[in-house]
Design a protein with these regions (language model features):
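Conserved strand-to-helix beginnings and helix N-cap segments that scaffold or border functional pockets
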Residues: 23-24, 139-140, 166-167
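Residue-level signal for short, function-critical loop segments
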Residues: 15, 43, 133-135, 159
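Short, catalytically relevant binding-site loops at active-site mouths
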Residues: 103-104, 135-137, 160-163
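Glycine-rich phosphate/diphosphate-binding loop of Rossmann-like nucleotide-binding domains
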Residues: 128-149, 153-155
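Core nucleotide-handling region used for phosphoryl-transfer chemistry
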Residues: 147-171
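Conserved thiamine diphosphate
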Residues: 2-128, 153
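Short, conserved, surface-exposed binding loops centered on an aromatic residue
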Residues: 88, 119-122, 144-147, 169-171
Length: 171
């Protein structure tokens, strides 16, 4: 298709359909030949509770992570999603980006985004929480509550699930 002509297709649909229903096509027709196609799926996870269980794709990250050569991105908020789209346009190869339905502001405009690099958002000495997507905001809120009780945790935004930032995880 378009990717064989030097263009960069950005495909968009609900995660249930993009990762679930189209899995075989993504695996065989995009990832195996390493076509430069970006799959951006919204309404992922349980953030679409009111839409019912048939639309709650909780397995999309796992499915896309298993596909050889597929890069998997899960932005924490709209600002990070915007930066991820621009980064994916420059990135060569198949990629899946999971977007949630809920608005969860986390970052300022000057927040750095690099595919494959996790970001430490809060330093702590007692424990570390690695989060992606909607859970980044939840982890930051939990860190505030724990800090009030004298427990200092690190919060790491792992927006790139694959390839994982192994150096950040092992630090």
């Amino acid at each position: 298709g378009l990717s064989t002509m030097g263009l960069i297709p950005f495909c968009s649909t609900f995660a249930m359909f993009g990762a679930g229903r189209a899995y075989e096509q993504i695996r065989n027709s995009i990832a195996y030949p390493k076509f430069n196609v970006k799959i951006c799926c919204s309404h992922a996870g349980v953030s679409v509770g009111e839409d019912g269980g048939s639309h709650q794709s909780v397995e999309d990250i796992g499915l896309m992570r298993l596909v050889p050569g597929m890069t998997v991105i899960v932005p924490a908020d709209a600002k990070e999603a915007r930066k991820a789209v621009f980064a994916l346009a420059e990135f060569q190869g198949p990629a899946y980006m999971r977007l949630a339905r809920l608005a969860t502001p986390v970052f300022e405009e000057d927040y750095p985004f690099e595919i494959g690099k996790a970001n430490v958002l809060r330093e702590g000495k007692d424990a570390a929480v690695f989060a992606c997507g909607l859970m980044v905001n939840e982890a930051l809120e939990a860190a505030k509550l724990l800090a009030a009780e004298g427990v200092e945790i690190s919060v790491i935004n792992v927006h790139t699930i694959k390839p994982i930032d192994a150096a950040c995880v092992t630090e």
